[in-house]
């Protein structure tokens, strides 16, 4: 079974939830017998052609533009796939690329779409762009042979909105990474950040408005917390928002840029708490990473975060700086206890890979 993945920036170690999803999923599918090729975007990967754990990666030119990048690259990637790769299935990631589901079908390829979240709710998009993304969702549901959705609530909503296509819409979540579970010494904390274990609050993600980091910084400043706030992440395209956010840096508000490997694992494991103040998510991989590392979490009360089913104290009203500030001030008084083993079983990448491979296999006929 030959699969061509389109819609992600690339793998491995490219910033983004979709990219993390694909980096975990496809090597496991290769072990199950799939032949997987990822068509990556040239600015985010090194080399024209290479392999990562059995997954073939081909770099195709992409314009770096907030709106045009995804659409232009997806269009040419589908044509490239049809002419040079000739896959049995095109696996499109996210509803922007899913706009081209009809094109892939017209070219004779079967299509599976993974819906990573209602991107039309993202703050950065104009009303016109939001309509295009909503239309992309409709094209996915209408023309794809199978639609996988990472959020349980979103799966139910799509089945209700498109009852005629409900049978081909399936819930398949993101997974947790077992590599974050083993204990790691605080000596792996980035030395230049001068952090003390259990004396900092952590957040991880791209510096874009829908992640809500501006709320977190404001809430932290308003709180009486004696901890530090560490923000791990960067942005693909520098913007007024990211520049303004970085201006809030102080001795206690630290922008740590991108981190990975043992550094990121140590940052999760030795944090007092992990906070995700997002306005928009699919199923937040960074929250699952924090839980797998044994770090207490505070999450905004948007549906994808509620789907994680953490204790009540773990949630705060999205956009409510005052309520978040109160929680940051009283972390020791909150019940943030999670049964990590339950989550590791529920969000196991091996099982998720098997389920995804089963849906792929079902499209062979």
Feature annotation, model-predicted:
Residues 20, 199-222:
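A conserved mid-protein helix/loop that constitutes part of the nucleotide-sugar donor-binding site
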């Amino acid at each position: 079974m030959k699969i061509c993945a389109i819609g992600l920036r690339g793998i491995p170690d490219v910033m983004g939830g979709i990219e993390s999803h694909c980096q975990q999923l496809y090597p496991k599918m290769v072990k199950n017998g799939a032949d997987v090729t990822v068509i990556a975007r040239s600015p985010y990967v090194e080399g024209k052609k290479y392999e990562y754990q059995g997954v073939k990666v081909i770099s195709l030119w992409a314009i770096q533009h907030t709106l045009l990048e995804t659409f232009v690259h997806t269009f040419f990637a589908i044509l490239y796939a049809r002419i040079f790769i000739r896959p049995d299935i095109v696996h499109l990631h996210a509803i922007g690329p899913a706009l081209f589901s009809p094109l892939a079908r017209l070219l004779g390829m079967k299509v599976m779409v993974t819906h990573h979240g209602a991107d039309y709710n993202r703050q950065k998009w104009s009303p016109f762009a939001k309509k295009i993304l909503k239309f992309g969702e409709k094209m996915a549901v209408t023309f794809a042979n199978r639609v996988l959705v990472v959020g349980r609530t979103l799966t139910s909503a799509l089945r209700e909105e498109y009852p005629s296509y409900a049978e081909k819409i399936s819930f398949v979540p993101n997974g947790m990474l077992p590599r974050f579970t083993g204990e790691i010494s605080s000596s792996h904390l980035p030395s230049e950040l001068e952090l003390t274990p259990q004396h900092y609050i952590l957040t991880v993600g791209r510096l874009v408005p829908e992640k809500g980091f501006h709320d977190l910084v404001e809430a932290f400043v308003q709180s009486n917390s004696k901890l530090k706030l560490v923000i791990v992440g960067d942005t693909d395209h520098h913007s007024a928002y990211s520049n303004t956010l970085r201006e809030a840096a102080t001795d206690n508000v630290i922008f740590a840029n991108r981190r990975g490997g043992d550094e990121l694992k140590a940052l999760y494991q030795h944090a007092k708490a992990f906070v995700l103040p997002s306005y928009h998510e699919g199923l937040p991989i960074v929250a699952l990473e924090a839980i797998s590392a044994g770090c207490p979490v505070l999450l905004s009360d948007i549906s994808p975060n509620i789907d994680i089913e953490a204790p009540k104290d773990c949630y705060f009203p999205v956009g409510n700086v005052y309520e978040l500030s109160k929680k940051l001030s009283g972390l020791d008084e909150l019940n943030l206890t999670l049964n990590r083993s339950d989550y590791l079983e529920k969000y196991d990448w091996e099982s998720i890979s098997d389920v995804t491979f089963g849906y792929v296999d079902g499209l062979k006929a």
